[in-house]
Amino acid sequence: LKQIDLHKLSDFPKNKMGKILGYDNDYLKMPNKIIEMGLLPETIFRILYQAPFNGPMYVEFGEEKSRIALRKEEGEYIIVEELN
C-alpha cells in the first residue's frame, strides 16, 4: 500500500508539485470562490510565493498554468498531497 502524506494547502512547501485531494469543509464554512476559481480535486498545483506575515500565497495550477492569490485561511480548507 502506498503511504499518502496529507497536507493543507496553507502548510504546503513552496516550489513543490502537489495534487488537490479534496476539502476539509466542516460546518460548510469553505468559501465558494475556491471551487469557482478551479481549485478542484485532482488538480496539480505549485505554490510560487508565500507573502510574509501570513500574507497571501500565490498558486499556479492546472494545465493552463493559471495563477491566483489565496489567503492562508482559505488554504486551510484544501487537502493536498505532495507529488514526487
Region annotations inferred by a language model:
Residues L1-N84:
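Compact, glycine-rich, soluble single-domain proteins
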